From Swiss-Prot:
Lineage: Bacteria, Bacillati, Bacillota, Bacilli, Bacillales
Domain of life: Bacteria
UniProt keyword Transferase, yes or no: yes
Species of origin: Staphylococcus epidermidis (strain ATCC 35984 / DSM 28319 / BCRC 17069 / CCUG 31568 / BM 3577 / RP62A)
Transferase among keywords: yes
Protein name, entry field: Uracil phosphoribosyltransferase
């Protein structure tokens, strides 16, 4: 069964309070999501494999540590996932970036893929799928299934807030994928919105309705 990591770091919780606040404008909301994405990425990448390299400092030669082999790929779920991508990239600027777009079928309510563009060596990289919200879990489950079909073997999912219902469905569908969240909220309401939540992350990021 996948592990659920809930971050209680004071800086993350402080910034998340402003992200949730309905009075927070688009510019500040976007900046805060970016910042929290960076802070979360620090912990998500904590156990990346390192290798020894020989370097020359201004004083002497030494053995240092660098990331081993192929490194990271960040895959935002369009469009809200874009808001977290730059924050992760500020920490690991050499990471490759894929994109996956999904929409909800109005009849079946299932997530349907309409766009996907991935690095060619996706099977050799540690994948971090990013999306601000894990509500029903449908989009995240479909995105991860799509990545696995393309050969991805090592995947993690990172979001700002999640509902227990979405976490449960993710664990059932992908028990090998660890979930990293800034807050686990109470529930989904009758419109499948996370409660208390933060509203529609995409609309708040891009100033749309």
């Amino acid at each position: 069964m996948s592990k659920v990591h809930v971050f209680d770091h004071p800086l993350i919780q402080h910034k998340l309070s402003y992200i949730r606040d309905a009075r927070t404008g688009t510019k500040e909301f976007r900046e805060l999501v970016d910042e929290v994405g960076m802070l979360m990425a620090y912990e998500v990448t904590r156990d990346l494999e390192l290798q020894d390299v020989e370097i020359q400092t201004p004083v002497t030669k030494m053995t240092a540590k660098r990331l081993a082999g192929k490194k990271l790929a960040i895959v935002p779920i369009l469009r809200a996932g874009l808001g977290m991508t730059d924050g992760v990239l500020s920490l690991v600027p050499a990471a490759r970036v894929g994109h996956i777009g999904l929409y909800r079928d109005p009849e079946t309510l299932e997530a349907v893929e309409y766009f996907a563009k991935m690095p060619q060596d996706i099977d050799e990289r540690q994948i971090i799928v990013v999306d601000p919200m894990l509500a029903t879990g449908a989009s995240a489950i479909e995105a991860i299934s799509s990545l696995k079909k393309r050969g991805a073997k090592s995947i993690r999912f990172m979001c700002l807030i999640a509902a227990p219902e979405g976490v449960e469905k993710m664990q059932e569908a992908h028990p090998d994928v660890d979930i990293y969240i800034a807050a686990l909220d109470e529930k989904l309401n009758d419109k499948a919105y996370i409660t208390p939540g933060l509203g529609d992350a995409g609309d708040r990021l891009f100033g749309t309705k």
